[in-house]
Design a protein with these regions (language model features):
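Divalent metal-coordination and catalytic microenvironments
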Residues: 19, 54, 81
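Conserved Switch II/interswitch segment of TRAFAC-class P-loop GTPases
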Residues: 53-63
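Active-site metal-binding loops of divalent metal-dependent hydrolases
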Residues: 18-22, 58-60, 85-87
Length: 125
């Protein structure tokens, strides 16, 4: 169990996915499908999209590590993307961005520990 947060403040929206994700583990396909459906249903509650900042798991241990970010961008969208939950596997996480579903978002994806975004971040509607 875990938490996820959507924060809107000062004209900027930030979504922290926390442990809410499309968890695609090595298990029966119907369990992974249920995880994907649940994640997309929860994401659909974020209206209006896109969010300005999104912090979403990109966990190399998963069978389909890109599923969560792909779902977020499909359902909600984000102006800046911050992968997380890759622990010490930064190189592996960066390599996962070559997934065809994620490649379009390379320009908005940030792996650095400190990131200065353009001022101001274009606020969401």
């Amino acid at each position: 169990e875990g938490v996820a947060f959507l924060v809107r403040a000062c004209g900027t929206s930030a979504f922290f996915s926390g442990d809410l994700n499309s968890w695609q583990w090595a298990r029966p396909a119907e369990q992974n499908a249920a995880s994907e459906k649940f994640f997309r249903t929860e994401l659909s509650r974020i209206v209006p999209g896109p969010v300005d900042l999104a912090f979403v798991p990109l966990d190399p241990r998963l069978e389909d590590p890109a599923a969560g970010i792909a779902a977020l961008m499909d359902v909600v969208g984000a102006r800046a993307l911050f992968p997380m939950h890759y622990w010490d596997a930064s190189a592996a996480a960066r390599a996962l961005m070559s997934d065809a579903r994620l490649a379009p978002y390379l320009g908005i994806t940030h792996f650095e520990d400190v990131c200065e975004l353009p001022d101001p971040v274009t606020p969401s509607a």
